[in-house]
């Protein structure tokens, strides 16, 4: 199609549907066009880049931005930055070049719904002490911070133990394209870097690793960017001691777990948000924005989430667990479970909490605050204030209009 034809088709759709988020609408439109065009030429050995709808395309782009931005690596990081994993290459490596790697990842699918349909790989659980050490090693790593406990443990269990018996073994080589992330369990590894740009691994192996940079010790890690990119390694990592033990995680396993987790979570958020009456005036794109802004928080049994008499500033959806609504002088008036929500009126009014909500069991919540809500929706908030539910008094059966049980259909 010519540019004029595409433009006319897009303009007609915009005029017909009058979307509130024009940029999102255009993004989805071109994503569908691109998908249709690629489907004509797709071959079995090419990268799977199709999506079932524009929402997944948008989600995938946002997820890549979230976890792969250069700003994610802070100045206080204790690890060696920008060391990726290793990819099989058609070169002659020396005998002590350790090929702890699989084949090229160029055919891996990055479609989150495709991950959800795959047969889930199971990994044997690690010894509790090993798992504890791995958790300590990756604590604070930006790649792991958004995983819930289940998927966090799944990632750690997916790591495989590798033993390197000799000193002088190159685990990764500068210039090679890699796809593994490593945690050092035992032994030490030296990091070297050549100053040349675009140097090849063959040149590194034939003329030396370059300048010494630092030494990686047990409990530290390297190669984390290989979990997101198949970009060339920025340095070489060579075993310094004999009898080394490292744990390796490949990019496909990691991304499958992370993308599947985030995709399922977003779909859950969107379905729950559809059941919130005060958000009923929002269109699909506005609810998607809210779903993307939700953050997961966990409260242990007995913890207070909101307290009666406080000014409300947060909205909550229950992902898992149970919460009790407690009124002064009345005790527990209702128990909220998965799919229920509370605090929504705090988003559009300066409301005082008329009840306390406390965790009855371990409670997993999705939440966002009023400033985020205002930033995302702007003028739409005025429309929400005029809805009958928003104008009602705070005298429902819980004594607080912002404590609400969702319809039975949302229960799991």
Swiss-Prot record:
Residues 392-412 are annotated as: Disordered. It comes from the Eukaryota. Pfam families: cNMP_binding, RIIa. 3',5'-cyclic AMP 2 binds at residues 278-412. InterPro entries: cAMP-dep_PK_reg_su-like (IPR050503), cAMP_dep_PK_reg_su (IPR012198), cAMP_dep_PK_reg_su_I/II_a/b (IPR003117), cNMP-bd_CS (IPR018488), cNMP-bd_dom (IPR000595), cNMP-bd_dom_sf (IPR018490), RmlC-like_jellyroll (IPR014710). The keyword Transport does not apply. Keywords: cAMP, cAMP-binding, Nucleotide-binding, Phosphoprotein, Repeat. PROSITE patterns: CNMP_BINDING_1 (PS00888), CNMP_BINDING_2 (PS00889), CNMP_BINDING_3 (PS50042). Tetramer, composed of 2 regulatory (R) and 2 catalytic (C) subunits. In the presence of cAMP it dissociates into 2 active monomeric C subunits and an R dimer. Belongs to the cAMP-dependent kinase regulatory chain family. PANTHER family: CAMP-DEPENDENT PROTEIN KINASE REGULATORY CHAIN, CAMP-DEPENDENT PROTEIN KINASE TYPE I REGULATORY SUBUNIT-RELATED. This is cAMP-dependent protein kinase regulatory subunit.
